Amino acid sequence: MTQVAKKILVTCALPYANGSIHLGHMLEHIQADVWVRYQRMRGHEVNFICADDAHGTPIMLKAQQLGITPEQMIGEMSQEHQTDFAGFNISYDNYHSTHSEENRQLSELIYSRLKENGFIKNRTISQLYDPEKGMFLPDRFVKGTCPKCKSPDQYGDNCEVCGATYSPTELIEPKSVVSGATPVMRDSEHFFFDLPSFSEMLQAWTRSGALQEQVANKMQEWFESGLQQWDISRDAPYFGFEIPNAPGKYFYVWLDAPIGYMGSFKNLCDKRGDSVSFDEYWKKDSTAELYHFIGKDIVYFHSLFWPAMLEGSNFRKPTNLFVHGYVTVNGAKMSKSRGTFIKASTWLNHFDADSLRYYYTAKLSSRIDDIDLNLEDFVQRVNADIVNKVVNLASRNAGFINKRFDGVLASELADPQLYKTFTDAAEVIGEAWESREFGKAVREIMALADLANRYVDEQAPWVVAKQEGRDADLQAICSMGINLFRVLMTYLKPVLPKLTERAEAFLNTELTWDGIQQPLLGHKVNPFKALYNRIDMKQVEALVEASKEEVKATTAPVTGPLADDPIQETITFDDFAKVDLRVALIENAEFVEGSDKLLRLTLDLGGEKRNVFSGIRSAYPDPQALIGRHTIMVANLAPRKMRFGISEGMVMAAGPGGKDIFLLSPDAGAKPGHQVK
């Protein structure tokens, strides 16, 4: 039965733009995509969006380490993420970035509305500061012992063990993640969102019955503990959006990250030339539905701060949050050393996307339970279910239809009651997809697959094919098998997009939810081609080994000059400005009697002569070759008395030593006495 079409906006949590997509990420994106594909099959108007979370200190620091700009890094990472999601056939309508003009404008709009409505408070706070790096430390760059449950090695904003949130100043024995130094306290003026003002609204939203029971129970614990004002600002240096009329202050990444949902949708509307839909979906009284698929680690932000921000800025709240658990591999946390910390791209080098989509789907429910990817069970389940039960149903019937009946199916069903059993299951299976009871849906479908294969086994078309005068029976039996295959693939279409494409090509028809009510009668199918290949443990072993090799490549010791001679501690610009570097002409160069390391250089600074002893003899056995060259010297270095005389400066050279010392020279045109700036 056709449903009334709904307008639905679906989002996944925004992947952080400083690392690759891995199988933990993929659980959420697959779960959301299966649900979205089902909604589309039922005729609903679905907009499915995501974006990269592209702001924050981690982005800034990693870009510095790579020697590139944050903009360049997040641009490259966005392309990588989108390639991975496309490889898994995640059907996004738009994939954007929080570092966008749409997101800037919306962040400033929401902030200004909150401020106008009295929900932004200013106050001076004491904040952790890294004395070695000269920067305030964001929450995730401080680690210590959780003040609530006393678990060690927890971040400065929330505990991954007990789920508590707190200020980084509350950590026990905090350490800077950047330098390892013990942070010191410094004062800074910050901006706070007045979350407690929304306590009554949030409690009513929690009691509405829409949220998962586990989420509602956790929120009740937070209400009982009392809501706190939320610090939404960070001090420079910071990669993000500067707060209007507050120089040197930036929006905290968790303020503009969820606004990224709105920014990505706004970008999609603009691409379509659709100026109406944005307001239609986000206005206060919107009748469109809004769903966020998220992991259990970010429930606090999405269940408290996000709806409160929307309420306070006169936008609509989410219809619901769909929260999932973590992914373990072979019963344990994903491990780089064991090769079970597997990137999405690595998986696709060894297996197809449909295999993981099916395995995750078969294990998912509407509860917030962790999902274990047992790699041996994965191989057995994919082969048993997809290959043996579903694909084999088509292959064992298609041969007879193609060879004996030119691909034409029978004009009547051999067993109408069995077919009705299959189509009647649409209600139960559809409800399971709708309610995210994916494991139940798969169990129902596989039970039908068992019925279909039992029918074929009992009818034994391979026996009938050898009996004279039974061509009509053979055609009817095999046509029945192919029609049952069609129903099964229709139910599995949200899960297996690539297998569905191949099945539709064979069946010579599109698979639609309502279409299965009418069987394919007198219909011509195409020649059968292999739809899916079996997988084996050798592929798993290769996958694990490849993951280990990737870890070795990314964690291998640094080689080259920096490994043996690392960069010194950071100095300030004022420190650097004290060094006066000048261009000098080498007027004379000679050996120093009694030294096997030094050369005596006479340097012209453009009106002033200097005598400098330099330890470069091993690289320049013929001092005369240096005469007439220009070099760089430290002109304001205090004279140093040596047993050979007084050295009045230092020339600049590079290299590890010995014969590999290279005197630095300025570009052509530089004159003696010119200052190096």
From Swiss-Prot:
Segments forming domain tRNA-binding: 575-677
Presence of the UniProt keyword Cytoplasm in the record: yes
Main location (coarse class): cytoplasm
PROSITE patterns assigned to the protein according to its UniProt record, in alphabetical order: AA_TRNA_LIGASE_I (PS00178), TRBD (PS50886)
Co-factor: note: Binds 1 zinc ion per subunit.
Catalytic activity field: tRNA(Met) + L-methionine + ATP = L-methionyl-tRNA(Met) + AMP + diphosphate
Entry binding sites for Zn(2+): 146, 149, 159, 162
Assembly and binders: Homodimer.
Family: Belongs to the class-I aminoacyl-tRNA synthetase family. MetG type 1 subfamily.
Biological role: Is required not only for elongation of protein synthesis but also for the initiation of all mRNA translation through initiator tRNA(fMet) aminoacylation.
Name of the protein described by the UniProt record: Methionine--tRNA ligase
Lineage: Bacteria, Pseudomonadati, Pseudomonadota, Gammaproteobacteria, Enterobacterales
